[in-house]
């Protein structure tokens, strides 16, 4: 009997040791992520997405999603350092989620509890999202959008007509020599205001044209649309002669203040997102991350 108890004790000790080894599923810069945190996050994701039964492949995907969300969360908390997320920020975030889902205020956490989800896992995720929003907010102060970027974005939408002022250079003949000279001219065209007649008058003519983009012929419309002011096109052939277009100015027509503001906000958010992604990518790249849970 004494031997049997000893064997049971040995096996019990072995199981406890195994449990302690598997209680940590990952570490981020020596900060542990426990199995309980991992399990709670999986459960939370399942409940919030109304998922009940999983195939083995789906369970693996869910495990990857849960562990990666916890790793990102840990990195964000470490990035924030001593900066505390205030309780009223958390409460307002939860109320916002409840409003979007048409839930009474104060019911979301209780709903999670009723589904056997640890509310702390949800609150930690809320905190990490608030840290992320603070990062985005700080980035917004360093982002600027130029008029040129706004014009390019509006032009690319093909929803507005554009008034074009351009210089069109046309060779006097279609010889190889004329083609060579036109290429040489193209490389010297920098700004409309700097163009002198002596640059081209021996082998080409120049016509100053004002036109709406929509009124230009197919080939010219395509070429001009892609050109920015004071940028010369490549040499192209028209009716056995060679042409170059140098755009002097572009004026987008009939853009309202609201439309302009929409484009500015879109471009600003895009730049902020790109900067944020770079920060988050660098967080991961520089971190010492170890995953001990089978992926």
UniProtKB/Swiss-Prot annotation:
The keyword S-adenosyl-L-methionine does not apply. Residues 1-19 form the signal peptide. Keywords: Signal. This is Uncharacterized protein RT0667.
């Amino acid at each position: 009997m004494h031997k049997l108890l000893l064997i049971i004790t040995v096996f019990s000790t072995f199981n406890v040791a195994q449990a302690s080894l598997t209680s940590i599923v990952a570490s981020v810069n020596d900060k542990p992520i426990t199995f309980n945190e991992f399990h709670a996050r999986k459960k939370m994701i399942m409940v919030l997405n109304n998922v009940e039964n999983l195939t083995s492949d789906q369970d693996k995907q869910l495990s990857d999603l849960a562990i990666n969300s916890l790793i990102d969360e840990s990195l964000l908390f470490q990035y924030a350092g001593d900066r505390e997320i205030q309780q009223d920020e958390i409460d307002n975030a939860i109320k916002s989620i409840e409003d979007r889902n048409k839930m009474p205020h104060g019911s979301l956490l209780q709903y999670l509890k009723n589904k056997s989800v640890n509310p702390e896992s949800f609150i930690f995720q809320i905190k990490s999202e608030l840290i992320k929003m603070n990062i985005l907010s700080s980035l917004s102060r360093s982002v600027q959008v130029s008029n040129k970027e706004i014009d390019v974005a509006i032009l690319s939408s093909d929803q507005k007509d554009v008034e074009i002022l351009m210089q069109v250079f046309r060779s006097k003949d279609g010889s190889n020599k004329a083609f060579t000279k036109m290429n040489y001219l193209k490389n010297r065209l920098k700004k409309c205001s700097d163009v002198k007649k002596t640059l081209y008058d021996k082998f080409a003519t120049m016509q100053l044209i004002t036109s709406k983009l929509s009124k230009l012929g197919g080939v010219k419309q395509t070429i001009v649309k892609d050109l920015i002011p004071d940028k010369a096109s490549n040499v192209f052939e028209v009716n056995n002669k060679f042409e170059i277009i140098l755009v002097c100015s572009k004026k987008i027509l009939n853009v309202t203040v609201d439309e302009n503001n929409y484009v500015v906000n879109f471009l600003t958010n895009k730049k902020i997102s790109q900067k944020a992604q770079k920060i988050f990518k660098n967080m991961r790249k520089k971190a010492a991350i170890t995953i001990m849970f089978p992926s």
